[in-house]
Curated annotation (Swiss-Prot):
Sample GO molecular function, one term: ATP binding
EC number assigned by the record: 2.7.11.22
Annotated organism of origin: Rattus norvegicus
Catalytic activity: L-seryl-[protein] + ATP = O-phospho-L-seryl-[protein] + ADP + H(+); L-threonyl-[protein] + ATP = O-phospho-L-threonyl-[protein] + ADP + H(+)
Domain Protein kinase: 4-289
Chaperone recorded as keyword: no
Cellular compartments annotated: Cytoplasm; Nucleus
Motif [NKR]KIAxRE: positions: 45-51
Domain remarks: The [NKR]KIAxRE motif seems to be a cyclin-binding region.
Name this protein carries in UniProt: Cyclin-dependent kinase-like 2
Key words of the record: ATP-binding, Cytoplasm, Kinase, Nucleotide-binding, Nucleus, Serine/threonine-protein kinase, Transferase
């Protein structure tokens, strides 16, 4: 286990804990289940051995992938692919229930995964929201096979205490030891309602309370289960309530807003008689999945999601580290410059956001409404506008911005007062008298010629431009009460040109 770096605790339970780790060689993020000392606890050893055995033979896109198994100092360690999101997390985010289409996609995959287990004569026995992982691409994966087991041979019996109470079928609650795949189908029915409504269907506080919730909604237990109930010493001295039809509150009455197709699917899964519950293959052919061609359409979409996850999991170490550094950088404060036309109408304002990191500047253009005809000095394609606008610079280090695909021009619009200087990228806020330097790319250079005189040579691809006070070739702005210095400069410049021409003509 020395090749793994511990990144933190994901969760812990009765039999051990799960840690988030990184493989030092490949850089891959994994989840490691660390069991308690199994040599000292027979139950822990039994659960660990069962999970290892079953997961080694189960490989499916909707089951969590076991990568490695090792034992160190009496402890078993199971290394899994890392998926940090569960359906329980979704239910916490959306307490009123998930979107109908999301539930369709989740449930389709859950049934696929359970069906694969059943086809290998394995029952999960602990289906619940926290045991259903969801990848970033939306691929569902069943996990925690500690209670799973192969179907019994004729005459063999199971342990009776399995599954979290709220998702436990009636046969498990009364202590039947000859149950089968139907216990997983029951849990699916509980999940359908919970995912759509946001609340557990049967939130019993004890086994007898759980039975009461079930019987109030679905009616009396079958005779075999009633007999087992009264034989079970756990329920000694307790009588089952007799639920009359008028007292029952069926699903359609309890959830009148749910579509009929949802109630139909849930009722099939929640049949009080386990022998009458459908198989997973039958559920996938239910109208809930077949209406509007959902099953066929989503099967193709799911394949793309699975391929995407496979690519992400097989990234080389260097790429993963680079990607991690990039993600970390997005979380840190970055200094940015916002060059914005402050005189334009607010409804038609254009702005350019420049992200500065090291020597690189990314430019992202954001538009609000239509473009102003007299906005910034340069269009995206480099052509000049008819006017000049003032420049507003502010620190936007807290703004989250995506990387643009095609960075635009890196030169901000010129100020009204051409003798003044806007703050440089690394300079303090405020104006500095003298010469203004702009760093522009190769694409922009040719559009700046009317405004600038080249100074000392600069590194390849970057040019320093000295903006002089000459305005002979510069397009003039419209008159504004905020720009008397420019009007004065233009007037004086025009007089000098006129005097110069008169002198030339006389000579």
């Amino acid at each position: 286990m020395e090749k793994y770096e511990n990144l933190g605790l994901v969760g812990e339970g009765s039999y051990g804990m799960v840690m988030k780790c990184r493989n030092k060689d490949s850089g891959r993020i994994v989840a490691i289940k660390k069991f308690l000392e199994s040599d000292d606890d027979k139950m822990v050893k039994k659960i660990a051995m069962r999970e290892i055995k079953l997961l080694k033979q189960l490989r499916h896109e909707n089951l969590v992938n076991l990568l490695e198994v090792c034992k160190k100092k009496k402890r078993w360690y199971l290394v899994f692919e890392f998926v940090d999101h569960t359906i329980l997390d979704d239910l916490k985010l959306f307490p009123n229930g998930l979107d109908y289409q999301v539930v369709q996609k989740y449930l389709f995959q859950i049934i696929n995964g359970i069906g694969f287990c059943h086809s290998h004569n394995i029952i999960h026995r602990d289906i619940k929201p926290e045991n259903i992982l969801v990848s970033q691409s939306g691929v569902v994966k069943l996990c925690d096979f500690g209670f799973a087991r192969t179907l019994a041979a004729p005459g063999e019996v199971y342990t009776d205490y399995v599954a979290t109470r709220w998702y436990r079928a009636p046969e498990l609650l009364v202590g039947d030891v000859k149950y089968g795949k139907a216990v997983d189908i029951w849990a699916i029915g509980c999940l359908v309602i919970e995912m759509l409504m946001g609340q557990p269907l049967f939130p019993g506080e004890s086994d007898i309370d759980q039975l009461h919730h079930i019987m109030t909604c679905l009616g009396n237990l079958i005779p075999r289960h009633q007999e087992l109930f009264y034989k079970n010493p756990v329920f000694a001295g307790v009588r089952l309530p007799e639920i009359k039809d008028i007292e029952a509150e069926p699903l359609e009455s309890r959830y009148p807003k749910l579509p009929e197709v949802v109630i139909s699917l849930a009722k099939k899964c929640l049949h009080i008689d386990p022998d009458k519950r459908p198989l997973c293959a039958d559920l996938l052919h239910h109208d809930f999945f077949q209406m509007d061609g959902f099953a066929e359409r989503f099967s193709q979409e799911l394949q793309l999601k699975i391929e995407k996850d496979a690519r992400n999991n097989s990234l080389p170490k260097k790429f993963q580290i680079r990607k991690k550094e990039k993600d970390d950088a997005l979380g840190e404060e970055r200094k940015t410059l916002v060059v914005q036309d402050t005189n334009a109408d607010p409804k038609t304002k254009d702005s350019k956001v420049l992200k500065v990191k090291g020597s690189k500047i990314d430019v992202e253009k954001t538009e609000k409404g239509t473009r102003a005809s007299n906005g910034s000095c340069l269009h995206d394609n480099g052509t000049s506008h008819k006017g000049l606008s003032s420049t507003s610079l502010r620190d936007c280090s807290n703004v989250t911005i995506d990387h643009p695909r095609n960075p635009g021009t890196a030169i901000p619009p010129l100020t009204h007062n051409l003798s003044a200087v806007a703050p440089g990228i690394n300079a303090a806020m405020g104006t500095i008298p003298g010469v203004q330097n702009y760093r522009v790319d190769e694409k922009t250079k040719k559009y700046c010629n009317p405004f600038v005189k080249p100074s000392q040579p600069s590194p390849s691809g970057i040019y320093n431009m000295n903006v002089s006070a000459s305005v002979s070739n510069c397009p003039l702005p419209r008159k504004s009460k905020h720009s008397p210095p420019l009007d004065l400069a233009v007037s004086m410049g025009a007089r000098r040109v006129k005097l110069y021409l008169e002198t030339e003509s006389e000579t």
